[in-house]
Amino acid sequence: MREGRWVTVTESEFEHERRGLEAIRQKLPDGDPWRAWSNFTFTANTGHVREVDLLVVAPGGLCMVELKDWHGSVTSENGTWVQTTPGGRRRTHGNPLHLVNRKAKELAGLLAQPGAKRVWVAEAVCFTDNGLRVRLPAHDQNGVYTVDELVDMLKQAPSDERRRVTAIGSREVAAALKNIGIRKSDAQYKVGPYELERKSFDSGPTWADYLARHSDLPEAARVRIYLSERGSDASLRQSVENAARREAAVLGRFKHPGAVQLKQYFPSGHAAGPALIFDYHPHTQKLDEYLVQYGEKLDILGRMALVRQLAETVRSAHASRIHHRALAARSVLVVPRSRGGKGRAVGEEAAWLTPQLQISDWQIATQRSGDSSQGQGMTRFAPTALSAMHLADDADAYLAPELTALNPDPVYLDVYGLGVLTYLLVTGKAPAASQAELLARLEAGEGLRPSSLVDGLSEDVDELVQAATAYRPGQRLSSVDEFLELLEVVEDSLTAPAAALDGPAEDETGASADKDPLEVVAGDLLAGRWEVRRRLGTGSTSRAFLVRDLEAETRRTRPLAVLKVALSDSRGEILVREAEAMRRLRPHSGIIRLAEPEPLHIGGRTVLALEYVGDERDDDGPGAEGATRPRRREETVARQLREHGRLPVDQLEAYGDYLFGAVDFLEGEGIWHRDIKPDNIAVRIRPNRTRELVLIDFSLAGYPAKNTDAGTDGYLDPFVDVITRGSYDSHAERYAVAVTLHQMASGELPKWGDGSVLPRMTDPKEWPYPTIAAEAFDPAVRDGLVAFFQKALHRDAGKRFPELKPMRDAWRKVFLDASQTVPSSHRTRPAAPADGAAPAEGAAAGIADAEPETAEQQRDRLAAEVTRDTPLTVSGLTPAAQSFLYGLGITTVGELLDYSRRKLVNAPGLGAKTRNEVQQRQREWGERLREAPVSPLTPKGRAEAKEELEQLTAAESALVGQLATGESAGALSARTLRSVSLDTLATVLVPAVNNNGSNRNKAEMVRLLLRLPDEHGVLPGIGVWPKQKDVADALGLSHGRIPQMLKDERKRWKAEPAVQALRDEIIELLASMGRVASAVEIADALAVRRGTHLAGREQRRAMALAAVRAVVEVEQLVPQEVEFQHQPNRKATDESLGAGLLALDVREDDAPDTPTAPGLLDYATRLGKTADRLARLDTLPTAATVLAELGALTVPPGAVDWDERRMVELAAAASVNAAATPRLEIYPRDLSLVRALRLTQAGLVRWIPGVPEGRQPGLTGEDVHERVRARFPELVVPDGRGGTAHELPTAGPLTKALRDAGFELSLSMREDTGTLRYLPTRVDEASSYLTTGAWRQSTRTGTVTRYADDPQLAGAVRAEERLLASAHRDGYRVLTVRQQLVRDAVRELGAERLGGQAVSVTELFLEALHGQVTPGTKPTWETLLKADAAEPGSKGAVRFAEYARTAWGSVEPRIAELLGDGGGGAGPVLLTEAGVFARYDAMGVLDRLASAARRGGRGLWLLVPQSDPSREPRLGQVAVPYQAGLGEWIQLPDTWVGNRHRGSGEVVASGVEGDAK
């Protein structure tokens, strides 16, 4: 193609790009309609400035091409593309097709002219290096080409002649491009003093991130530019501006090493919109990309350390009342650590294995702020319904289900985010491809269990993830503090085996001395004195550790202390200032003390030693391993408010009295705390169980009074720096006290104005004081508290209390007046001290003792005995719940059951734990004491549907009842329509019976067809997708009558706005699931999104399937308007699969390469048949076999964008009897329970050393069920009546199945809890099914574990475990070993326990080569040897290459034959002396052998000798390919080869069935 037709808008600055473009230009035709433009930019309607490498106009349409000059090989791991360079370095890339697709759609939108012919822009990625080995899965190869393949694709005729581009159309495109303003690619852009790179490296719907450099200083930065869409309405533009200001305001306030650091905010910094400048490390990676590159090198403890980093950052944000709300893999940045202990530099790998995580993307964060000057930004620009539009698409799978609800709890959103990120860190995989897919799995009962993907994982990790990610917020952990406590349990369980070893490590002190104090772990010793117990958390200036002072006895001090380690030298100065302030204080029981008067200097860090304030019970001596003493926790008043809501009146009086006493003491000492708030009031629990409050954190006490900004937003007096004051004073200190008291009394902060302006900008006449949360106060003290706070929080300091004493007297008077009047509510009383326990010295009166351990059991017993008339005082509710309910006028259980659940949830002053407790009891008692909802079609159900609509939105309250009565709902917004529950939808779909009963048959026909429960809650017994014939038979009507009646209902449904909104939602779900999904999968997603009051899983699914069925029926009304098709699966053995599949058809706005619905359904059918064939195999097929078999099927025409997991799931959904495990194995749904128990090793019993047998936790039946369900979620068992059931057996049948599976277990009662659990029948002979940690091992003293203190021994054990796990399975493994130890390694690998069959590849090759030489003929053997050393390209070298290829043709089938021998149970084929693969250009042979091993038969092990086994495997100078996601690389440390790990004990690996993987 000549210049002119090919327009080079900008000459590329890269030589490789110029070469690639020239290669394409030479091959393109030079005639109409062909045209091309290279290297230009355009500005999309969204505001994004897009860079385009090449745009080609061809007869088949327009194509946007992204050029990639990659070398080596490219693979895909968990959706991330990984390039392995010829030098062996791995580089991660996002799938470039996604961005090109987005840019193509944006350009097509610009080219679209009103009234003109629609222009389609396809997308393509072109690899310009023909030597690149592309090993992408089939779904990732759509749109990926070499130069020749690209040109061939462009020359193809259009699939639809209506879309052919003619010469005239080509000229119109050229004119349109000129009109939209394609232009030269500016090399740089500017924002303030920063010059931007020309391509953004990341982007979202409303923003783009650029790398930038300062024009004058040598510093790099990340610049985020927020973009406003052209022509968007004012609300959208305002939402974008607010997102930018919100992110800037949050990060301007929240300074923490675990959050990205904002450098500067330019509200008008760029022509496109606001700009934010962030600090940026050039090697920063996103979390999912980091795990692809370094995940294999992280052990489970390293992964948990990263989880802790994230959780501590989020906890610190929550302490500042900031909530991220949208945690996802892309919002976590990974930065290599720059230094180790004592400031020493660390190596590259060590820097990446202990990185710093930083949370980014705070654009939809919230801050529940008070009203200081900075805080108003967060209130003024609070997230709205439009906020989710600012999130990138790849965050979708990580977002909490309720994010888009009207008012979701931000704490629960962040807890959920931490849970899914924990799942990602542990498994290396995202929880799902999309949120819709994940919701469907959650509704189907498949919780997130990392152990379903990772062998040998601690059960505590599963518990942590499941407790954080329950899809009902009320069932999640209620705070990040609880998450961290459960994380500590996980860390304890992971490190427990190492603690069981006899004797301390000899070099313990020395090892700890060299460690960076910031990185110490439990057991480390600092400065020879402080023994680390655990890490408490990380703040903005320091990291805190709980330690035991080994010199406490001689110094006569408390045994426990807290060390605050400064995060940097500058932050160390803050600790020094804090110590100076605290040294001036005399001892006081209510004020935290220094354990050491001067700051310490340990390991190059400044360290402050403080007394420990927390749970001191049972700390004077180490408890027995496994003892059941209560877990220590650090409690603050803030945590108590978060979990239980406002304080009961008696506690409020006592806590307030304490606070006044502490502040009075500080005034006498001449000190201002300057940061008084509930977070800084700790609760000490003494050994005798009494409590006292302690004021902590004096880090701001030494700040100059002129610095009026120091403090926490919301508690800082917003009028402190007015002209009449100008510096911090006692009024400001008392203002913080008043705000803290207000929060204790109500659970809320006072608020100035409506949040639209700063507090000092409010009208003094209208706002002399803030809004007091009077409704949240206890009625007994409400009037007195309102008067108190109106004076204490007055904007004019002259009208406040002049001194602390009158303020304290007024506070006491509130409670004195309340005690002298007839109480209108119950008041709680503090618990009496335990017998013989005297109150702690200085403890405030009225602070209740710590609750006994059995309190929860006592409450459960009381709750089980209640009736409707039972008073709340004896109902088993906690005092906090009782106090709150009394405030609502509720005094009995019956009154609570009759109270509206919705009103209860929204009541002010209610804490998270208290809310969960009340809701749980309300559900529990409701099921037992009142009629549970059985069907929405009862009169009561229809009335509740009407009530639901009344509460959907206040703005639309005039439309009450329109849906429930079948009237027009056209005025309801789409957002409101999508909030309608499934119960209310059922009342829309099924007409109410007339008074005269004339439409009774029609109503019953609809109910039966949709399979909705009757008035007794019974579902029709005619299948999950009833046939019209069955409905007619059930009603006694003719078969022809049903279609007639149904036609009228279809018309009515089609006209209903609620059904239209439901149809749009289902189409969106289909699009997000790859255009095909099972009806059940769609239904499960709807059940989570919409909700239903029915409790049973079968009933919930039936309600959702009814909604899907109605939309399918409506779709069939007008065939010409069909946008999706339905295909039933009548032969399925599982009833739920009978509902069949839905497939999205090609629509008006879809791309030309979109596959049709019939094509997709046919493909799914073929996948289902293949899955059924795999399920019938005698051996459970591995993931590699499944993917190979399914991948071999012909894909329908068009782009099918399914990842491997989606393909396997759809194959199972379209099958008759197949199901898929989370590991992508295929199994029959009626798999034998005995075999399932054996495959999952569900009978392994956790045995805690040192704990008596009667108190061993053992293994409960529920534990066994969970282990089986985690691996085989769709397993069914015989029900004894000729059918099958999902419920797994219990008691005797389960015990028999366990014994048949090889686990000799028996049921017995646990003494301390009274629960039934399994224990080994004979403990002394049970070593084959005991586990003491993540992997089973011998219980003999001296056993070496993967948690051994010696990392070399631990590495050897890990290698042993992985070798044993793969020795008798198919698959491919690359083993790296030190070069000098090859012979010993071969001997160990060939030992009986591993059974490797050593095969010398060099010997086979030479034998095959020698076989081609006939004695007495030419060439001779000597001639061949000379040719081997000939110059490359010479005649001899070319001739030798021919002989080598022939030799490999003989070697490959010989090795393949070995792989096929012996079946899956034989030992692996061990390839040694394999360097000839690389030397004689036979890496392709190795690839084919590896692929064969992955498909079944014997395993293939490749031994690769190297100078350093920890380096990426290489044969000579050639990188050895392997799949990291399948764990195919195993490092063999010197300790493993030397058998040191087996010298002092025997490692017993979990024996699994040979076909497991």
UniProtKB/Swiss-Prot annotation:
Keyword ATP-binding set for record: yes
Work out whether the entry's keyword set contains Transferase.
yes
Q: Which InterPro entries match?
A: BREX_PglW, Kinase-like_dom_sf, NERD, Prot_kinase_dom, Protein_kinase_ATP_BS
Which parts of the sequence are annotated with region: Disordered? 615-634, 821-861
Keywords in UniProt for this one? Antiviral defense, ATP-binding, Kinase, Nucleotide-binding, Repeat, Transferase
- Report the record's Gene Ontology biological process terms: defense response to virus
> From the Swiss-Prot or TrEMBL record, what is one GO molecular function term?
ATP binding
Classification via NCBIfam families = BREX_PglW
Q: What is this protein called?
A: Probable kinase PglW
Q: Which organism is it from?
A: Streptomyces coelicolor (strain ATCC BAA-471 / A3(2) / M145)
Q: What is the lineage of its organism?
A: Bacteria, Bacillati, Actinomycetota, Actinomycetes, Kitasatosporales
Q: Which gene encodes it?
A: pglW
